[in-house]
Amino acid sequence: GTGRAGEAAARSFVSIELGLDIAQCNFRTREGEIDIIAKSGVEYIFFEVKTRTNKKFGSGVEQISARKALRLQTTGQRYLEQIGAENADWRIDLLSVEMDKTGRVQKVTHVENAIEEQS
């Protein structure tokens, strides 16, 4: 589906545009899943990939809800524990992939620390 094409586009964006090393894709635990985990120097970046096919859903770049962010955080923590890097710095970024109706990727938008502020 569009999700898969979106994730492929997101992966090449991370390695080519951002020039980062991808450590793992689709890392899953009981708590959740992280689409892409990359490393930037000593910092780990947990990427959430959102794919959408049309502009109707608001063209402003979305944020990650606080609840979802918490799941990503817990999942990310698990990943760091597994690789023996639980004290590493990390952040959660968003990759928003926009596609046209034929499923071609139009644009990838990268938002650092894309978590909604809790009111």
Annotate each language-model stretch with its function:
Residues 31, 53-55, 98, 117:
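Feature marks short, surface-exposed loop/turn motifs that line or immediately flank catalytic pockets
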Residues 82-119:
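Domain-level recognition of nuclease-like catalytic cores that cleave nucleotide substrates
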Residues 18-46:
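Active-site metal-binding core of divalent-cation-utilizing nuclease and nuclease-like domains
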Residues 14, 72, 92:
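Residue-level signal for inorganic ion chemistry
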Residues 36-57, 72:
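Conserved catalytic cores of phosphodiester-cleaving nucleases, focusing on short active-site segments
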Residues 27, 49-51, 113:
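Active-site donor-binding loop signature of nucleotide-sugar glycosyltransferases
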